[in-house]
C-alpha cells in the first residue's frame, strides 16, 4: 500500500511538472541491484550425556561440533545453515521544483524504494519498502532561509532527521549565522520514526511516541575562521522527560601567520554530565605534499531511553598522523598511523586479571598515473587491538580510454585473527567494474567480484562464505530546459 502511494505521488509530480504547474524541475533517478549469497548459523542442542571430549580437551558433539554446556540437561551449539541468496534492489529519486510563482520558493524531495527480489528474502533494511529520506519546501530570501517538511541536519552532534521546521538568518555585517530547528524526531541513523515496527529489537522498551526535538546553532564565519556552537534537546511527549540533551563546539582557523590550519571540536552530554567526543587536528599543506597530525577522543552516544546507555560505554583516546607526497607528476604516496588506548572501565575480571586496553593501526599506499588512460593504485594496512587484529592489502588498475568509458580491475586480501573467538577469518577477492557515460544525463555501470572467504576453526563448524557478487546500476537525469540554457556569447575586454 505504501509503495502504491509513493508511485502515485511520483506520477502526479511528473504530470504536474509536465503540465506547466512548475516552470522548472529536475529529477535524478538511480537504480541499483546486486546478487549475494551467504550461509548463516542455526542454533542446535544436544543432551548433556551425549557430549564427548574433543582432541583439544573441550566438549563436542559426536560429529565434531564444539558445544557450550551449563548446569542444565542440554548443551548448545551452532551449525552452518543452508546457503541463502538475496537480490536487493534499490531505486532512489531526487526531485527539485522551482519557479512556483513565489520568488525564492522551491520544493525538494529524496526517497527510495527497496526490496529483496531473491528467493530467500534475507536482505536487511527492506522494510518499509518505501522510505522518504527528505522532503521539504524551502523559501530563501536575502539573508533568510526557511524550510518545512522532512529534514536532515548535519552538525557536530551527528546528523539528525526530523519532521518539522528549520530557519536560518545571516547578518552579513558581523558574519554571523543563527539557525533554529524543531519538530518530531526520527530514529538515530535511519529515516524512520523511533516508534516504527521496523525498529523493534527491544519490544516493550521501544518508545510508544516520537520524541520532540529542538535545537539552536550559531556560526561565526569571518574570513578563514569558522566557529560554531550548537545545542540540542529531545523530549518524550508522554511525560516530558529528557531523552537527550547535548551541546557541541567546533572551529577551524589558520594558525596565526603560519601555513598551518587548525580544526577541532568537542561535545558534552548535558543529560548525563559526561564529556563526549573531542578532536584537534593541525594540517600543513604545500603544492607537492601535505602533513597532518592530531589527537581525538571518542565516546559512543546513546539516548536515555535505550538499554545501551545504562552500560556506561568506555571512551578511547588516540593520536594520529597522516601524510601525502607527490613525488612526481605521475607518482603520489600516502601514509597514515594511529595509536589508541581505552580509559579505565572500572570493572573487576577475576578470570583475566590484566585486560588489554590499547592498540595501533597503520596504512600506506600510492597511485601511479602512467598516462592519461592508465592508473595503478595500491594500499597496505595493519591493525593490532584488544582481542583482535587485521592485515589487508588491495590494488586496482584503471583504464579510461576516453571520456565515456572506464574499466577497473581490483583485488585484495584480508586476514582477521580473533583472540577471543573460536575461528580466524581470511578473505580474498578479485573483481572488475565497467562504467559507461552514455551522455550527460545517463550513466550505466556493472561490477562482478569473486570472493573466497574462509572461517577457519578446529571443529566441524568451520564454514566458508565464498561467493560471486554481481552488482549493476543505472542513473538517469531529466528535467526542464530552464537549467540547461546555453552560456551567453563571450565578451572580449577592451585593449
Predicted segments with their positions:
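Bacterial N-terminal signal peptides that target proteins for export
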Residues: 1-7
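Bacterial N-terminal signal peptides
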Residues: 7-17
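Gram-negative and organellar
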Residues: 22-495
Amino acid at each position: 500500500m505504501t509503495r502504491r502511494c509513493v508511485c502515485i505521488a511520483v506520477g502526479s509530480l511528473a504530470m504536474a511538472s509536465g503540465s506547466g504547474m512548475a516552470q522548472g524541475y529536475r529529477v535524478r533517478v538511480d537504480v541499483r541491484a546486486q546478487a549475494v549469497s551467504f550461509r548463516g548459523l542455526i542454533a542446535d542442542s544436544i543432551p548433556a550425556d551425549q557430549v564427548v571430549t574433543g582432541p583439544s580437551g573441550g566438549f563436542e558433539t559426536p560429529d565434531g561440533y564444539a558445544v557450550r554446556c551449563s548446569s542444565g540437561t542440554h548443551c548448545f551449539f551452532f551449525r552452518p545453515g543452508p546457503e541463502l541468496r538475496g537480490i536487493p534492489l534499490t531505486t532512489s529519486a531526487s526531485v527539485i521544483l522551482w519557479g512556483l510563482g513565489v520568488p525564492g520558493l522551491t520544493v525538494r524531495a529524496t526517497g527510495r524504494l527497496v526490496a529483496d527480489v531473491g528467493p530467500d528474502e534475507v536482505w536487511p533494511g527492506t522494510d518499509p519498502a518505501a522510505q522518504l529520506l527528505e522532503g521539504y519546501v524551502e523559501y530563501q530570501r536575502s539573508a533568510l532561509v526557511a524550510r518545512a517538511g522532512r529534514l536532515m541536519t548535519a552538525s557536530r552532534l551527528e546528523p539528525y532527521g526530523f519532521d518539522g521546521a528549520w530557519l536560518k538568518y545571516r547578518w552579513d555585517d558581523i558574519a554571523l549565522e543563527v539557525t533554529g530547528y524543531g519538530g518530531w524526531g526520527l530514529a538515530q541513523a535511519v529515516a524512520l520514526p523511533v516508534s516504527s515496527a521496523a525498529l523493534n529489537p527491544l519490544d516493550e522498551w521501544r518508545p510508544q511516541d516520537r520524541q520532540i526535538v529542538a535545537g539552536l546553532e550559531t556560526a561565526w564565519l569571518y574570513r578563514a575562521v569558522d566557529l560554531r556552537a550548537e545545542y540540542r534537546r529531545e523530549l518524550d511527549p508522554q511525560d516530558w522527560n529528557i531523552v537527550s540533551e547535548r551541546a557541541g563546539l567546533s572551529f577551524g582557523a589558520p594558525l596565526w601567520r603560519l601555513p598551518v590550519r587548525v580544526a577541532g571540536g568537542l561535545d558534552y552530554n548535558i543529560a548525563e554530565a559526561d564529556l563526549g567526543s573531542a578532536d584537534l587536528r593541525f594540517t600543513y599543506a604545500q603544492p607537492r605534499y601535505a602533513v597532518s597530525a592530531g589527537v581525538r577522543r571518542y565516546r559512543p552516544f546513546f539516548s536515555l531511553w535505550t538499554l545501551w546507555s545504562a552500560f556506561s560505554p568506555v571512551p578511547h583516546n588516540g593520536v594520529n598522523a597522516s601524510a601525502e607526497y607527490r613525488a612526481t607528476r605521475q607518482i603520489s604516496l600516502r601514509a597514515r598511523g594511529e595509536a589508541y588506548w581505552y580509559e579505565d572501565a572500572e570493572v573487576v575480571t577475576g578470570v583475566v586479571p590484566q585486560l588489554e586496553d590499547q592498540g595501533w593501526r597503520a596504512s600506506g599506499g600510492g597511485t601511479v598515473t602512467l598516462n592519461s588512460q592508465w592508473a595503478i593504485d595500491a594500499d597496505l594496512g595493519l591493525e593490532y587491538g584488544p582481542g583482535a587484529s587485521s592485515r589487508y592489502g588491495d590494488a586496482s588498475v584503471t583504464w579510461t580510454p576516453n571520456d565515456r568509458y572506464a574499466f577497473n580491475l581490483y583485488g585484495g586480501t584480508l586476514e582477521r585473527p580473533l583472540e577471543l573467538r573460536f575461528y580466524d577469518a581470511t578473505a580474498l577477492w578479485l573483481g572488475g567494474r565497467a562504467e559507461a557515460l552514455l551522455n550527460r544525463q545517463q550513466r550505466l555501470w556493472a561490477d562482478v567480484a569473486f570472493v573466497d572467504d574462509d572461517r577457519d576453526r578446529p571443529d566441524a563448524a568451520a564454514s566458508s562464505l565464498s561467493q560471486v557478487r554481481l552488482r549493476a546500476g543505472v542513473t538517469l537525469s531529466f528535467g526542464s530546459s530552464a537549467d540547461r540554457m546555453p552560456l551567453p556569447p563571450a565578451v572580449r575586454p577592451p585593449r
